[in-house]
Amino acid sequence: MNILVTGGAGYIGSVLVEILLRNNFNVTVLDSFLYKQKSLDKLNNDPCLKIIKGDVRDEKIIKDLVPKCDIVIPLAALVGAPLCETRPQEAKEVNLDSISLLKSKLTKNQRVILPVSNSGYGIGKPGEFCTEESPLNPISLYGRTKVKSESIIMERDNSVSFRLATDRKSVV
């Protein structure tokens, strides 16, 4: 099984790539290496790993990579509200437009697994945990791009979205 992971050198991506390789998947990582990450260095010699330095907004790269995979896991993003607010156009292009581009190159048999940040939930009700059924009320550009990307991907069959939420207890 061939899997394309965009943003595969990022925090979640690098952990996921290692797990996929351990389970004998062929993995292609597309990452811009914006922060010069070294997270995949220890996996460089794995014959099942192919690393492409490139931009998820580059139609030529996407057109070349997508037909070679069975599953796409789009993790590439400008992450976090502060970064997205200071670079709104780039946030829209990377977090949202690249998802539309990716979707346009998929066949009906290819699957997509899309995790969505807890930023999609916005501010929840005090004392209540978010669930898959909780309303999505993003309060930041980052959250809005992630929610919209989910709706774009979920318009097609063979797609799964995982809404990720965290619960932090404060010491104070």
Predicted features by range, described:
Residues 6, 30, 72-76, 112-118, ...:
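SDR active-site strand-loop-helix element
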